[in-house]
UniProtKB/Swiss-Prot annotation:
InterPro entries: RNA_methyltr_RlmE, RNA_MeTrfase_FtsJ_dom, rRNA-MeTfrase_E, SAM-dependent_MTases_sf. Its EC number is 2.1.1.166. It comes from Cereibacter sphaeroides (strain ATCC 17029 / ATH 2.4.9) (Rhodobacter sphaeroides). It catalyses: uridine(2552) in 23S rRNA + S-adenosyl-L-methionine = 2'-O-methyluridine(2552) in 23S rRNA + S-adenosyl-L-homocysteine + H(+). This is Ribosomal RNA large subunit methyltransferase E. Belongs to the class I-like SAM-binding methyltransferase superfamily. RNA methyltransferase RlmE family. It is found in: Cytoplasm. The keyword Transferase applies.
Length: 244
């Protein structure tokens, strides 16, 4: 936060400090203070994004270029909507670039998400039995990109949280295998912890390129990273009748 120095000595950066309110834990106070001083949080407010996470997908797309005008994107775990906002811009879902094809963006989340211009948002438990079919019905065809920023509620136990998010990634990957166009891209947030190795192996079988990235917008003290799998090889053909 930039504030004018009334002493006339020019401008200086002032760090916002939060007093520990009665009943508020010190950890909560420190988190709030970090949020208020986070340059990505400040930038998101200025640029109209719903959260700092928008810059993670921006930075990943700047590096790999998977969000293209005319693209069809599915965003799993889309709340509060930052990734959808970026996707709408990059795939030209609002048709603002008249000489470029218009894309589509479909967002899904367990919690209600405020409407986003240019995106179709649905409230849904993606782990429910009929979730895949519902999303495919809303999509109405194949997708070029499936993105997952899904995360389970934190348990406070690092190992448990790691396994939960890997399970969500695996569910998202299975869905991606079912809906992606050949050559499509899968992007997902994971937490480092060891169990992601099987997911990596699965993705390498189904995509021509798999990269693990920690974008600058991801906090240095966070165990999160992102897997970007590009060049979907396509669904295996069904065996002929009589084949083993």
């Amino acid at each position: 936060m930039t504030t004018k120095n009334t002493s006339g000595r020019g401008q200086r950066e002032l760090r916002v400090r939060v007093k520990t309110a009665k009943g508020r834990k010190l950890s909560s106070t420190l988190w709030l203070e970090r949020q208020l001083n986070d340059p990505y949080v400040i930038r998101a407010k200025k640029e109209g994004y719903r959260g700092r996470a928008a810059y993670k997908i921006l930075e990943l797309d700047d590096k790999f270029g998977f969000l293209k005008p005319g693209g069809r994107v599915v965003d799993l775990g889309c709340a509060p909507g930052g990734w959808c906002q970026v996707a709408v811009e990059r795939v030209n879902a609002l048709g603002q670039r008249k000489n470029k094809p218009e894309g589509t963006v479909l967002g899904v989340d367990l919690q209600e998400v405020e409407p986003i211009s240019g995106a179709e948002i649905h409230q849904l438990d993606f782990l429910s039995d009929d979730a895949d079919e519902k999303v495919k019905g809303w999509l109405g065809g194949r997708a070029d990109v499936v993105m997952s920023d899904m995360a389970a509620a934190a348990s406070g136990h690092k190992g448990t949280d790691h396994l939960r998010i890997i399970a969500l990634c695996e569910a998202a990957a299975a869905f991606a295998f079912d809906v992606l166009e050949e050559g499509g891209t899968f992007v997902a947030k994971v937490l480092a912890g060891g169990a992601e190795n099987e997911l990596q192996a699965l993705l390498k079988k189904n995509f021509t390129k798999v990269a693990n990235v920690k974008p600058p917008a991801s906090r240095a003290d966070s165990s999160e990273k992102f897997v970007v799998a590009m060049g979907f090889r396509g669904r295996a053909s069904e065996p002929e009748e009589g084949e083993a």
